[in-house]
Amino acid sequence: MTRSIIAVLPAAGVGSRMQADKPKQYLTLLGKTLLEHTLDVMLSYPAVSKIILAVSKDDPYISTLSLDPKIQLVEGGTTRAESVLNGLNAIAEKNAWVLVHDAARPCLQHADIDKLLAIEDKQGAILAIPVTDTIKRADNQQCIVKTEDRSQLWQAMTPQFFPVDILRDALSTGIQQGANITDEASAIELAGFRPHLVAGRSDNLKVTRPEDLALAEFYLTRNKL
């Protein structure tokens, strides 16, 4: 049976670290919001049949955007995990797989989605990059306790790619247990699965701090050349 590919974008966060007057996904670069740039990547990828966008109930910005008919809005939750779960609960398709992607990660390239979709193991897969910087563990006083061995450490990115039913069950269970679910893979891991790590690109950055905007603008400009 052919699997359908659906993208879910949690976009209900406020992005407090950006120190901006609006959620970071609505900041503008090159004439479009970060969210629109991210949606463009998914809309232009042929295998993605639908995009589910989880936004805050009182979001005053989403109505100002011209959204493609392939985009379905759902109400976001108080956490990322709840927003993603709400998106998954809106999926009725059988044999569906989901690409969960950060709304503020606009520089994703189609070649990286290709690599994820090559994975057919139901354990799923995530984009990630090997850690190259030296990693220090700190105590409560922000003093170094030890230097970590980085040889087997990877930095998780998105998209993260899983069968809808498996991810839905994993997130539901994790939320009920009060687990610290920082990404979809962490819920999958708690359910006993071992997702694949697919090497991504460092320019697939998540805009988190003010200084990230200039770098994202550079990458977006380069990608359009």
Curated annotation (Swiss-Prot):
Keyword Nucleotidyltransferase: yes
Transferase recorded as keyword: yes
Pathway(s) it belongs to: Isoprenoid biosynthesis; isopentenyl diphosphate biosynthesis via DXP pathway; isopentenyl diphosphate from 1-deoxy-D-xylulose 5-phosphate: step 2/6
SUPFAM superfamilies assigned to the protein according to its UniProt record, in alphabetical order: Nucleotide-diphospho-sugar transferases
Site feature location: Positions MEP for the nucleophilic attack: 150, 206
Matching Gene3D superfamilies: Spore Coat Polysaccharide Biosynthesis Protein SpsA, Chain A
EC number, UniProt record: 2.7.7.60
Single GO term (MF): 2-C-methyl-D-erythritol 4-phosphate cytidylyltransferase activity
UniProt keyword terms in alphabetical order: Isoprene biosynthesis, Nucleotidyltransferase, Transferase
UniProt name for this protein: 2-C-methyl-D-erythritol 4-phosphate cytidylyltransferase
Gene expressing this chain: ispD
